[in-house]
């Protein structure tokens, strides 16, 4: 454990094309094996596809999709007297954003379209319309928190 306290959060650098830190974070989530150029090409092509299909600004559509995916509650395991309870807790904004990006990319990878660009574009469009697997994941997370509301007094 560090003696100087927690490491400070580094600021997210905005990406050069759209000037948005959210797009930069999405590129870093898509990134595999250090191939950042490939990840950028996938994200930028997907955002172009989003803007051509929806007719709206791509970054605005992405932010709307992330708002629809971002969870407000989640459950965390808490051990009390030999039994483990799933305790609902509020999600901090930074973690909510991270979870939204993680779910968006993971469910885009699991889609059936031919290229990753198409998968990501269609998942962003579905999420912005309140559909898709990533939005369903948020609903399931909220449902778990709702069903375990009885254990909310174990919060820490």
From Swiss-Prot:
Quaternary structure, from the entry: Part of the 30S ribosomal subunit. Contacts proteins S9 and S11.
Keywords noted in UniProt: Ribonucleoprotein, Ribosomal protein, RNA-binding, rRNA-binding, tRNA-binding
NCBIfam families assigned: rpsG_bact
Superkingdom field: Bacteria
InterPro entries referenced in this protein's UniProt entry, alphabetically: Ribosomal_uS7, Ribosomal_uS7_bac/org-type, Ribosomal_uS7_CS, Ribosomal_uS7_dom, Ribosomal_uS7_dom_sf
Coiled-coil intervals, chain numbering: none
GO MF term set: rRNA binding; structural constituent of ribosome; tRNA binding
Matching Pfam families: Ribosomal_S7
Protein name, per record: Small ribosomal subunit protein uS7
Taxonomic source organism: Leifsonia xyli subsp. xyli (strain CTCB07)
Function: One of the primary rRNA binding proteins, it binds directly to 16S rRNA where it nucleates assembly of the head domain of the 30S subunit. Is located at the subunit interface close to the decoding center, probably blocks exit of the E-site tRNA.
Family under the similarity heading: Belongs to the universal ribosomal protein uS7 family.
Swiss-Prot/TrEMBL GO biological process terms: translation
GO terms under cellular component: small ribosomal subunit
């Amino acid at each position: 454990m560090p003696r100087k306290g927690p490491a400070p959060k580094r600021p997210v650098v905005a990406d050069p094309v759209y000037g948005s830190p959210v797009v930069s974070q999405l590129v870093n989530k898509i990134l595999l094996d250090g191939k950042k150029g490939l990840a950028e090409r996938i994200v930028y092509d997907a955002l172009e596809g989003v803007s051509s299909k929806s007719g709206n600004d791509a970054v605005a559509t992405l932010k709307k999709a992330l708002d629809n995916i971002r969870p407000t509650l989640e459950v965390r395991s808490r051990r009390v007297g030999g039994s483990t309870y799933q305790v609902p807790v509020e999600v901090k904004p930074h973690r909510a954003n991270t979870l939204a990006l993680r779910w968006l990319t993971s469910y885009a990878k699991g889609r059936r379209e031919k290229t990753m660009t198409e998968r990501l574009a269609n998942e962003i469009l579905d999420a912005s319309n309140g559909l898709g697997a990533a939005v369903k994941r948020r609903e399931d997370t909220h449902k778990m928190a709702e069903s375990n509301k009885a254990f909310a007094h174990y919060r820490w």
